[in-house]
Amino acid sequence: MATVLSSPRAPAFSFSLRAAPATTVAMTRGASSRLRAQATYNVKLITPEGEVELQVPDDVYILDYAEEEGIDLPYSCRAGSCSSCAGKVVSGSLDQSDQSFLDDSQVADGWVLTCVAYPTSDVVIETHKEDDLIS
């Protein structure tokens, strides 16, 4: 004798074909497998060789993106536990919650470790500042 199991009906979904706004939003799948909107910010790096501007996604470390663009920035640990990649924020904001080297007062004073810093707004950073930080 065969048993037939019935499944509940799938919920109904509706959608609209209204025109989307002219802005572009990239959707990415994060570590949690949930989709999220990805913002991109203008990051200006003031290096000893001059200024460079990059459009950095909010989920990419500034150092990593600079390297992808062929910009040579100092680094050592790539984990936020040393000062090799130290910079100074001139304006803007970022998330460097993965770092463990800087104390709260240094972060409040605008120090940044570019190897573990994500932009959260347009930002200007003076790079190559390790000597200033540790002196």
Swiss-Prot record:
<keyword id="KW-0150">Chloroplast</keyword>
<keyword id="KW-0934">Plastid</keyword>
<feature type="domain" description="2Fe-2S ferredoxin-type">
    <location>
        <begin position="41"/>
        <end position="131"/>
    </location>
</feature>
<dbReference type="GO" id="GO:0009570">
    <property type="term" value="C:chloroplast stroma"/>
</dbReference>
<comment type="function">
    <text>Ferredoxins are iron-sulfur proteins that transfer electrons in a wide variety of metabolic reactions.</text>
</comment>
<protein>
    <recommendedName>
        <fullName>Ferredoxin-5, chloroplastic</fullName>
    </recommendedName>
</protein>
<feature type="binding site">
    <location>
        <position position="115"/>
    </location>
    <ligand>
        <name>[2Fe-2S] cluster</name>
    </ligand>
</feature>
<keyword id="KW-0479">Metal-binding</keyword>
<dbReference type="InterPro" id="IPR006058">
    <property type="entry name" value="2Fe2S_fd_BS"/>
</dbReference>
<feature type="binding site">
    <location>
        <position position="77"/>
    </location>
    <ligand>
        <name>[2Fe-2S] cluster</name>
    </ligand>
</feature>
<dbReference type="Pfam" id="PF00111">
    <property type="entry name" value="Fer2"/>
</dbReference>
<feature type="binding site">
    <location>
        <position position="85"/>
    </location>
    <ligand>
        <name>[2Fe-2S] cluster</name>
    </ligand>
</feature>
<dbReference type="InterPro" id="IPR012675">
    <property type="entry name" value="Beta-grasp_dom_sf"/>
</dbReference>
<dbReference type="InterPro" id="IPR036010">
    <property type="entry name" value="2Fe-2S_ferredoxin-like_sf"/>
</dbReference>
<comment type="similarity">
    <text>Belongs to the 2Fe2S plant-type ferredoxin family.</text>
</comment>
<keyword id="KW-0411">Iron-sulfur</keyword>
<keyword id="KW-0809">Transit peptide</keyword>
<feature type="transit peptide" description="Chloroplast">
    <location>
        <begin position="1"/>
        <end position="38"/>
    </location>
</feature>
<dbReference type="GO" id="GO:0022900">
    <property type="term" value="P:electron transport chain"/>
</dbReference>
<feature type="binding site">
    <location>
        <position position="82"/>
    </location>
    <ligand>
        <name>[2Fe-2S] cluster</name>
    </ligand>
</feature>
<dbReference type="GO" id="GO:0051537">
    <property type="term" value="F:2 iron, 2 sulfur cluster binding"/>
</dbReference>
<dbReference type="GO" id="GO:0009416">
    <property type="term" value="P:response to light stimulus"/>
</dbReference>
<dbReference type="GO" id="GO:0046872">
    <property type="term" value="F:metal ion binding"/>
</dbReference>
<dbReference type="InterPro" id="IPR010241">
    <property type="entry name" value="Fd_pln"/>
</dbReference>
<dbReference type="GO" id="GO:0009055">
    <property type="term" value="F:electron transfer activity"/>
</dbReference>
<keyword id="KW-0408">Iron</keyword>
<dbReference type="InterPro" id="IPR001041">
    <property type="entry name" value="2Fe-2S_ferredoxin-type"/>
</dbReference>
<keyword id="KW-0249">Electron transport</keyword>
<keyword id="KW-0001">2Fe-2S</keyword>
<keyword id="KW-0813">Transport</keyword>
